[in-house]
Amino acid sequence: MGKPRGRKLEKKIKDQEFHPEQDSEKISENYNYDGHPESDTSNPQMFFGVLDRDELEYFKQTEATLSLDTFETEEEKAQFVTNVIQEAEGKELKLVTSQICSKLMERLILNCNDIQLKKLFQAFNGNFYNISCHKYASHVVETLLVRSASLVEKELITPHFDNMDASVDGSDVFAPMESLFLFMLNEIKPHLKSMINHQYASHVLRLIILILSSKTLPSTTQNNSIVRSKKSKIARKMIDLKDNEDFNKVYQTPESFKSELKMMLNDLYSDLTGHAKPKAEINPTVITKFREFCVDKVASPVIQLIIQVEGIFDRDRSFWRLAFNTNDEKDAKEQSFMEYLLSDPVGSHFLENVISFAKTKYVERLYRVYIKDQIVRLAKRDTTGAFVIQSLLKNMKDKEVKEILDALLPDLSILLNSNMDFGTTIINACIKQNNYKRDEVIGQLMKKYYPDGSSEKNILESCLLLASSTLGNTKDDWPTAEERRRSIFLEELIDFDDKFLEVAIESMLNLPEERLLQMCYHGVFSHVVEHVLQVQRVDIIKRKLLLNILIKDIVKLACNAYGSHIVDKLWDFTAKLTLYKERIAAALVENSEMVKNSVYGRQVWKNWQLEKYIRKRWEWKKIIKESDLETFPNMRVLQPNMQERAAIKRKNDDKAFDSMKKSRK
């Protein structure tokens, strides 16, 4: 058969390439995966009316009052919350869709009691999907769901609540929180597919999956929260809207939640695939559309979470099979999809995460078929493929990890130019593999940061980039995130091998004294100085040289937020150097007024036990000896027992008698 060429070959290659739709949300909302239009049932109703001027002003004032939180007692605050909830009755939907009043609703949910929580939950019945799609109301739903999960666990552990059967006035009877939650799930089930890539509802869906699968419910303000968007986390910090103790926890859930999760994901799979059964032949169009979800910036985190939890009840990993093949053969369309994942920021983040919790045999297949032959090339893609390679180093078996290390080590010094995290990952992989090629790793790192041929080598300059940093600035610039990353990396190098500790100290001693002292006052670089003060790893000569510099500014260091930690560390660092310890103590006592007037200085004064230095010097010296012996146990000189003493005395007496006889002769 002749070799294919020309336009037919070009068309075939083009058909096999993966090109995600730019407007995938629009397409997925209007069409099923089999290409047929779907009924328009997922368009949310998000207008529920507006508050009148007086109501709006009242709720604004109550939001400000709760925000200030100046209540004298908890009872007073609880009564205030009760009054506001009563005033808000019947207006809940108007409140949650208002920018200002939605914050009030979140504060009410965070501060209400269990009965009030159920009442608020019931107020949204029939509209959970609608408000989940709203910019402001979706945040209220997330807060409500977290508190509801806490109450579900509470009722599960303590099944009977005499005071939970009715409301305070006896007008309402509430079902268990579990039933209310399941009722809410039935309401949103028909809309699951449209929620996957909805800008706001996707966050609610992820939280629901986390609750049903008993995973950690994330904080809404932490930077690494997996539910809230970056803008939302920043906004909550700015308006001082804090989580309560129900967040950032794992909750025990009833068996019905696991069953509901299974049913929900099965329904979603059926909806996505045109009612195909698991492991059945899937339409290629369905697979392409699902892969578009995998690289969609909104839908991708939802798909990642689904792939993570499906293993709880589905051994066949149906959703994984929608994204990837499971046979050992290379597939042209899958290869195009993998190349897109490895070169796209969203796609690489998706692949990086699913590698960490997918079945090992599935990850090994992807590595063997598509990644193994291009490890170095992918590692040089700083914002995409590099993160996938790092994830493989953390999660693959020993054999594959060693293969990756063998491929990367010759180019490590080049990779570190643009991706310092690679150094950390390789160090950790080396340690995990019983110090595999440790000497080569050290050699490559030294070549990068402390080259032998350089006359001006200084690991502080090469690793921390001191010359272009905020060190010594008089503008009160905050340390940058890049400086923080570099400092942490240098500390990891110091922990990895004594060579890096030695060159770090050597580099500090080669700096101008003023420059080294500036590091001690820096919010980030001070941690590096503190980290080298490891008494058992630094020889006594280097310790003395460092102490000679630090003692010159010891009083100011003790009164500084960052320098005080260094002074505290000097207590141990001066072990077996009592003279230096006494010089530091004398300098601090001589400037006692300045030290005691500083909150940091007072802590140093306490840690150095300077009151005993002044009043009971002998006891202070005794503490020094005990501390030195604890740091260097081999210093202890064992006292001879009684028999040994007698033997020594007899030996000495015999020597004295022999010498006396000789003198007489």
UniProtKB/Swiss-Prot annotation:
Annotated keywords: Nucleus, Repeat, Ribosome biogenesis, rRNA processing
Region described as Disordered: 1-42
GO BP terms, alphabetized: endonucleolytic cleavage in 5'-ETS of tricistronic rRNA transcript (SSU-rRNA, 5.8S rRNA, LSU-rRNA); endonucleolytic cleavage in ITS1 to separate SSU-rRNA from 5.8S rRNA and LSU-rRNA from tricistronic rRNA transcript (SSU-rRNA, 5.8S rRNA, LSU-rRNA); endonucleolytic cleavage to generate mature 5'-end of SSU-rRNA from (SSU-rRNA, 5.8S rRNA, LSU-rRNA); negative regulation of gene expression; post-transcriptional regulation of gene expression; regulation of biological quality; regulation of primary metabolic process; ribosomal small subunit export from nucleus
GO molecular function terms attached to this record: mRNA binding
One of the record's GO cellular component terms: nucleolus
Compositionally biased tracts (Basic residues): 1-11
InterPro entries: ARM-like, ARM-type_fold, NOP9, PUM-HD, Pumilio_RNA-bd_rpt
Subcellular localization, as worded in the UniProt entry: Nucleus, Nucleolus
Main localization, broad class: nucleus
Extent of the Pumilio repeats: 87-122, 123-158, 187-228, 285-321, 333-368, 370-406, 510-547, 548-586
Bias kind Basic and acidic residues: ranges: 12-28
Similarity remark: Belongs to the NOP9 family.
Function: RNA-binding nucleolar protein required for pre-rRNA processing. Involved in production of 18S rRNA and assembly of small ribosomal subunit.
Protein name according to UniProt: Nucleolar protein 9
Gene from which the chain derives: NOP9
